Amino acid sequence: MTMIRKFKLYQYSIPVDSQLILRNRFLKKREGLLVQVCCDDAQGWGEIAPLPEFSQETLEQAREQALAWLEEWSASDGSAGKLPLEHLFPSVAFGLSCALAEMKGLLHEEGNYQVAPLCYGDPDELYDPLNQMQGEKVAKIKVGMYEANRDGLIADMLLEAIPDLHLRLDANRSWTPSKAQMFAKYVKPEHRARIQFLEEPCKTPAESLQFAEETGIAIAWDETVRDAEFQQNPPHFFTPQVKAIVIKPTLVGSIQRCVELIKQAHAHGIQAVISSSIESSLGLTQLARLAQQYTPNTVPGLDTLDLMDYQVIRPWPSSTLPLIDLDSEYIVPIKLD
């Protein structure tokens, strides 16, 4: 029996919060692709959204590659086996793998929508959401954008004020060893255990590990997970100071690749945290479903929707942002030859 395969591709461009800075660049809008795949009566959606300054591929490159893959996929009837995703750009592999998994019923419906509230610098933003939070209290703070001693003081102040709070901190490799030490100096030793982890404090993994050994502050890998050295030998990076790896599927690749990383981390007793690359609500809800399916006991890092002015196609359960659909001026179908 011949299967009928079809696809549609759309491009979205949504205004975002004007304060959003990615590696010293203001991001005015978030752009990406929405893909729909259909096979007979089954269908699935995915999002392909390279993150400027972080992804290796541009949106144009991703669009070209996705179109070529989808055209080959739709022209085949599946008898020649699966079309591989591994050679594709990470954002393309992830978006296509989500669409295919949805279509085949392999991506579970239930999602983990508990978020770690994200703070870009003003700690007052965190008190209300944290005091209202049920269950485990986890918040995330971006550090490394201001003075290291200020970052240390803010972290210490929050831990002092909310005794059952655990913090995730993200430095994006921005500190020298001496600046990282300056941060630690302002966090009281009795509070350091409640820093769940500090992502990539220093410019190199070796410096970050040394910082963790000297201060007792646990660290997590984020950028390192995508480095060639890590991919060749992950266990080398799973030392006692490392408490988590952060997996951003848009930057890592297909669902299958992400699951491999999760299993490697769990085998070494290390948390795997599914995290956002500032996807639209469509991509974020799929990340929440992935998190529930593969890391059910870990709060994912998905608190980025409020940076956007709109939700796209599928709503995040608790969001009050307006929802746009395929008729919106912000979504354009990509014409197929």
From Swiss-Prot:
Metal-binding listed as a keyword: yes
Binding site for Mg(2+): D170, E199, D222
Xref: InterPro entries: Enolase-like_C_sf, Enolase-like_N, Enolase_C-like, Mandelate_racemase_C, OSB_synthase_MenC1, OSBS_N
Superkingdom of origin: Bacteria
Cofactor(s), names only, from the UniProt record: a divalent metal cation
Primary enzyme class: lyase
A molecular function GO annotation: magnesium ion binding
EC code(s) of this entry: 4.2.1.113
Keyword RNA-binding among record annotations: no
Active-site residues, record numbering mapped to chain: K142, K248
HAMAP family assigned to the protein according to its UniProt record, in alphabetical order: MenC_1
PANTHER family, A to Z: O-SUCCINYLBENZOATE SYNTHASE, O-SUCCINYLBENZOATE SYNTHASE-RELATED
Function: Converts 2-succinyl-6-hydroxy-2,4-cyclohexadiene-1-carboxylate (SHCHC) to 2-succinylbenzoate (OSB).
Family: Belongs to the mandelate racemase/muconate lactonizing enzyme family. MenC type 1 subfamily.
Protein name: o-succinylbenzoate synthase
The gene coding this protein: menC
